């Protein structure tokens, strides 16, 4: 029987390796989102990558279960721990890449592209509806900004990276529960 520390060490090692693969996949999604403002085809890949991420997470977790099954059966707790750690390491990679990209390379182009989207006629029409306008006015009053453009320009690279990390940590916990349920080692029936 394996010791808990050995099982944890093995689970953590696999989570780091496979979380790295998942993190690079998420970075590909970030690249498609950012480059999609210049090449619209790449923007259309973003939903595919987002929807494919849980599937990739499932297949990576299934790979983990297949690799360690002989050492010790993977119960729900170990499967959840692996999945959570895998998503955690992927989030760290994506957060770091996001911060580096927006600090060193973006130079505000993503914010400017979003501001340009606000100037499109269909967006102006949508934003001028009474319900949306009241929400915008409430947000501007609460935050002290004079316009949406000013609010967008106030977003720092650290804020973008922190939001991505927060969101992905939450999603990681949520996705870890069903993934762990499906990948745990099934008992052999005699």
Regions found by a protein language model. Give the residues of each.
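Alpha-helical transmembrane segments of multipass membrane proteins
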Residues: 21, 25-29, 53, 90-98, ...
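Functional transmembrane-helix hotspots
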Residues: 96-135
């Amino acid at each position: 029987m394996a010791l808990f520390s050995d099982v944890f060490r093995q689970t953590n090692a696999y989570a780091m390796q496979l979380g790295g693969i998942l993190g690079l996949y998420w970075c590909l999604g970030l690249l498609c989102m950012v480059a999609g403002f210049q090449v619209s085809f790449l923007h259309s890949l973003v939903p595919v990558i987002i929807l494919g991420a849980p599937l990739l997470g499932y297949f990576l977790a299934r790979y983990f279960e297949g690799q360690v099954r002989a050492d010790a059966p993977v119960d729900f707790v170990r499967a959840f721990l692996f999945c959570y750690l895998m998503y955690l390491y992927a989030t760290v990679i994506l957060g770091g890449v996001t911060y580096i990209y927006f600090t060193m390379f973006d130079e505000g182009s993503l914010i400017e592209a979003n501001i340009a989207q606000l100037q499109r006629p269909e967006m102006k029409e949508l934003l001028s509806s009474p319900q949306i306008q009241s929400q915008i006015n409430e947000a501007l009053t609460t935050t002290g900004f004079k316009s949406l453009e000013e609010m967008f320009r106030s977003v720092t690279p650290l804020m973008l990276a922190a939001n991505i990390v927060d969101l992905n940590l939450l999603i990681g916990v949520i996705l870890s529960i069903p993934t762990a349920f499906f990948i745990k080692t099934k008992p052999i029936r005699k």
